[in-house]
């Protein structure tokens, strides 16, 4: 299991931002982006017997990670000849956000499920050319350790914590939470390039403490019974937000649409949103059945890991005011840490759909 697929579903790096920002200069000559993705759910999802000739073809791009897990039931529905949908849907799954963003910017993708900060980057790059439809995934990070004395963030004081994502959102999130807990100066963050390296440290040292994304956290716990995940950073963020009096949440993934497509095909966008919302509800209520679909779509290899990881992925469909409340404050935290992580400036109000 490669870590980049799931790390990339949480963040876009500074390097990734610069590569996207340079598309205009480079003439957007990135013909290989589509080749790196994997077409998914295409059988019966193009115009067929169940779709009228006046239907709209909707091109959806997403990532092989938590941001797509909540969509798998809708993907399965769209692939059926008896889907009952008015429009046709094609899905492309990629392993990194940097593969999806050029396609979205060029207009080759209509709707995309991408990291929250990447959505802000694209908004700025396109001068407000995309709209955020919803938050689809909250936090997917957990503190993992065999040290039973660790039960809260304050217990990390004086400790070393191993994690991935130096110079990207995991580092900014961790710094924010440690500062909120009043222990920022007493915790050492040691970064690894791969989540598997963090798992290796946890396996070899029973006193080690790590921060892992899903599904790596679930997989690590399944392989090593001594490990536990005592702190869910999504819950820790909620506590910090409550203390500071804001409504922000720890956000991993969002769904965006090109404004040109939204203006031309509002009914298709609404149908997608309805299907996505129902899909998230299905996945959360039926993790065992959903796990099978997760494997079928090539997101994970193990149904057992998928089933256990689903509850920890915090799959949601936050729209309207809840969307803006959750996302705006999160982007503000990232902006304060590194403005380039959100594209240089924070999105204006028109970024938030029906907020």
Language-model features: locations:
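N-terminal secretory signal peptides
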Residues: 1-12, 16-31
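Bacterial signal peptide processing site
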Residues: 34-36
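Sec-exported extracytoplasmic/periplasmic mature domains
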Residues: 76, 105-106, 124, 179-183, ...
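Short, glycine-/small- and polar/acidic-enriched structural segments
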Residues: 40-190, 214, 226-232
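Conserved C-terminal helix/tail region of periplasmic/extracytoplasmic solute-binding proteins
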Residues: 328-355
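Secondary-structure end/capping motifs
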Residues: 262-337
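Pocket-lining segment of extracytoplasmic ligand-binding domains
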Residues: 117-118, 197-293
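Short, solvent-exposed loop/beta-turn-alpha elements that line the ligand-binding surface or hinge
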Residues: 79-87, 234-248, 315-324
